[in-house]
Structure formats: C-alpha cells, structure tokens
Amino acid sequence: MRTSQYLLSTLKETPNDAEVISHQLMLRAGMIRKLASGLYTWLPTGLRVLHKVEAIVREEMNKAGAIEVSMPVVQPAELWQESGRWEQYGPELCRLTDRHNRPFVLGPTHEEVVTALVRYEVNSYKQLPLNLYQIQTKFRDEVRPRFGVMRGREFTMKDAYSFHMNKESLIETYGKMHQAYCNIFSRMGLDFRPVLADTGSIGGTGSHEFHVLANSGEDLIAFSTESDYAANVEMAEALAPAGERPAPTESATKIATPNAHTIAEVSAYLKVAEQQTLKTLLVKGEEDEQGKAGVIALVLRGDHELNEIKAEKIAGVAAPLTFASEEEIRAVAGCDAGSIGPQNLQCRVIVDRSAAHLADFVCGANENDFHMTGMNWDRDVQGYEVADIRNVVEGDPSPCGKGTLLLKRGIEVGHIFQLGTKYSEAMNATVLNEAGKATVMEMGCYGIGVTRVVAAAIEQNFDDRGIIWTDSIAPFQVVIIPMNMHKSERVQELAERFYNELQAAGVEVLLDDRKERPGVMFADMELIGIPHSIVIGDRSIDNGVVEYKYRRSGDKTEVAIDEIIAKIKAQLNK
C-alpha cells in the first residue's frame, strides 16, 4: 500500500472529548471517527487492525472445534420473553417495533437466538457436543458511552455457545475454550490474566474473565504472590483473620461525637485507627409474600469496603443491592446513617469476618452525634451472623493458601460461562438421550470483545510518540520512509525495489510516498505504530546502507542495502 493512495487521516492534536489514551491515539492515528455518542466509523488503518484480531480469534476458535455461523442482529422480542430476560434486562436493551407493530430488540448477545436455533436443528445426543460461534455486531444502549470503542454502544464481538448432554461434557469444552482464549491473547502479544469472575446478568455457575493488565483498567484484579490464583476483586474471598479474637479489655462507653459522621471524622475525633472502628450499612431485604421488604444491617471494619456482589449473594438480601432510605434507617436504628451501630437493631445483622475479629471497637451509638467505644461482640452485641462481605485489600492472605494478594487494574476483553440449563430449560431445548428420553441440554457461552481488544492493546502498548503494535495485529508490518524521493531518483528506485520485494515475500508494507517533510513522515508512522521501519536517504545510499528502526525499543541500526530484506524477514519470523 502507498500512502498516496491511502486514507491516512492522522491528527496532530488530541480531540477534547477523548479521555483515555487508547481513544486519543485511535483518533489521532486515523483508526476511527465518531459518528454519534458511542458510535464509530472504522477507517482503513483501524479496520486492518480489527481484521487481524478477528483472524486470530477465528483461527483459534476453529482449532478448538467451534463452528462459525452468523445470526441476525435484530431479534424477535418473543425469544427474550420466553427466556425471561425481556423483563430482567434494563434500558441498555434497545427495543424497537417493525411496521406491523411487532416488538424486536437489537441484540446485545445471542443466547436466546442460538438456543432457538439448536432446539430445532439438534434432536439427538449423537449430534452433541456442539459449539457454534460468530463474529458480529452487537448493540447495547449504554447510559453513558465513554472511552471510545472501549465502552461504545455498537461493537464487534465474538460470541460462542456450546451445547452438551451433561455437565462433564460442558466442563471439558469449557476447558478447551479457556485454553483457546489463552492462545488468542498470547498470539496478540498481550499481558493478560484469566481470573475467577461473577456470572452477572448472563447467569450460570462457573465463570472466568480475561483481563489485559493496564493502569487505565476499570476492574481491579487480585493475584497471589506465590501461585497462579487470580480473581476479580468482586469474587476474591477475604479470609477470616488467623487466631482467636482478642479478649475485651475496655468497658462500653457512650461518647459525644458532634459533627463526626464519616469513619475518617470519627477516628480523627476519637484518636483511634480506622481499622478499630465499625461502619454499619442498612440495605433492603427481599420482599415477603405480602410485598413488604425488611432491612438488613451489614457491618464492616471502618477501613474496608463493602463488596456488593458478595452482599447480593447472601440469602434474604435484595438484588440489585439497594441501600435503605433515611426514613427506613430512622425506623430501624433511631438515628441518621452516620451514627448507626450493630447493637440492639431490630433487624438481621451480618458482620464481615474481619469486623467480627475486633475487640474493644468503636461504633455508632444509634443516637445522633454519639458513638460507643470499648464495644465487644457477644458481650455488647448479640444475635449476629458472620460472612465474607468485603473487598480484599493488598496484603491479604491469598484464598489459595499460598502467598498474599497483589492488586492490579485490568480491562476485561473476554468472559466465559458455564450456563448450565438456564436458557435451555426456559426455552425447552431438549434432545433425546440413549434411552430415547428428552433431556435438557447443558450450555456454555464464551465472549470476546473484539473492538475492545484493539483499545486494550493500545492501553498496554504506547509511548509519548504513539501506538506500539505487536507484529501480529499491526495495521502494517513494515513502513518504508524514503526521504526526498521526489527529488532523488535513486532513493525512489531503492524504495520501489524494497516495496516490491517485501510485497512479493508476503509482507504487509506501507510505502510513504507523500511529498512531505521527513519529520512529518516519521511522526505519522510512529503515531500509527508500525513495528519496523526502513529509512532511505541519499547519504545512506552513498555508504551502501539504509537505516532500520524497531518501533518498540526505538533502536536504530544501519544495515547493508542487500541485507535489509533478509533482516526484516528474520525479525518477522521471531
């Protein structure tokens, strides 16, 4: 490809609405252009990268035994009503009607469609296991699209769905897909981690997320220092402190704490460490048969954060987690939120493991502007339950029993689930087993955010000059930069020679044949992030050499004219 025949579309300035580095660089490198909120046009450079990612995904899915299909983006509402997700899904599900006033959705995912397909096409255990996938456009009406293609409304996704006679078969395919995902992200040259994860709105049992590690990541990942254990903070278990709880040494005392409502204010006023204080949060419980929802108290150490996912999984706690209103708080505790304590509450009390290990702690007095000191479990507070309801923190013991936890930020680019029979049972997707009896199929689903992978790769691979692509997903492998080629016949001839030889060797090469200053050409190619550069000039030709530059390291070397093609091939074959 020649730049004179190409839509390069680079920008010198960063658009004001681009927050994260991947969004900034994708706009500046001429990869994407915004059409509307959360909607982007992919320009030639971006599309080349997107196609590279898709090709790797497709190859590894095929190797893993999955079969490619293509399903409609527009889906009939009746399928979502059949699965029960028509009511469960929020406003991010884009609902529409056709000219006959029939309801449809723009598909954010395809569990319903693929289940409807398989229940008609598969009727015998002999046809299982079956793993179908597609690489296709999805639409989720995000309330606040941001970060460019990282969280857009329209995006490209690889979604696969497997069907099985039993759980054992599902687990086997799940393992194959886990390995396929590791292969995919390794081939892209990404630093990633598979982590234990929550199943979220998709449902099911076992689940892993795949995260590209990056400081800009929205998710926090917990890793063991001495094992392969890794989990999303939402799922990482916070173990109970070792040893026995200390014995009480103080008497319970009520102390005035005027204008001290937060943990920081209370600990500063009483001159105690935050980890010696408790905070009590009141949340709504599930509705009873009369439609009434009670209140449940969740108690944590003052320096710890509530894990809402863990809290939602406690029997009786309403999901999604909803905090009690001011009126409900006063009815249960007799005070405002900043003064609640776990003692004498007329509701169920659930205490985090670390909080339950404290002695002589500080907590609210259930009276405005007062707190209790010297409080102790069982002596001063009775009738409580103990559970893991907090986020882990760095330095906590690893749940695997080896080492302690480190925390890093990650960008979720893939998610795999063992769905079980959630959709197949709801939609009556059965096959006949060996005895001729109808059996509900077990299902798995496996997603990769293809467009998000492109952005995540940039978040992990950039410098102050632009993107640094790995060879496997770069828009071009090599760029030829001939200085003053329109004034030097021999520079032009050598550039054309290299261009033709590299093309003949199957190398994806870009020849920058614009009438531009060398500084502009260098800046554009570093911004785009092409891994390998060949710089040709009259002076270097006089010395029988050209300059080779490796984008990632910035190293420059002079290479003999007759050896540069062999060097490029060797670099690409590493």
Curated annotation (Swiss-Prot):
It is found in: Cytoplasm. One of its GO terms (cellular component) is cytosol. It is an enzyme of class 6 (ligase). GO terms for molecular function: aminoacyl-tRNA deacylase activity; ATP binding; proline-tRNA ligase activity. InterPro entries: aa-tRNA-synt_IIb, aa-tRNA-synth_II, aa-tRNA-synth_II/BPL/LPL, Anticodon-bd, Anticodon-bd_dom_sf, Pro-tRNA-ligase_IIa, Pro-tRNA-synth_IIa_bac-type, Pro-tRNA-Synthase_IIa_type1. Its main location: cytoplasm. One of its GO terms (biological process) is prolyl-tRNA aminoacylation. Homodimer. Belongs to the class-II aminoacyl-tRNA synthetase family. ProS type 1 subfamily. Catalyzes the attachment of proline to tRNA(Pro) in a two-step reaction: proline is first activated by ATP to form Pro-AMP and then transferred to the acceptor end of tRNA(Pro). As ProRS can inadvertently accommodate and process non-cognate amino acids such as alanine and cysteine, to avoid such errors it has two additional distinct editing activities against alanine. One activity is designated as 'pretransfer' editing and involves the tRNA(Pro)-independent hydrolysis of activated Ala-AMP. Consists of three domains: the N-terminal catalytic domain, the editing domain and the C-terminal anticodon-binding domain. This is Proline--tRNA ligase. It comes from Tolumonas auensis (strain DSM 9187 / NBRC 110442 / TA 4). The lineage of its organism: Bacteria, Pseudomonadati, Pseudomonadota, Gammaproteobacteria, Aeromonadales. The gene is proS.
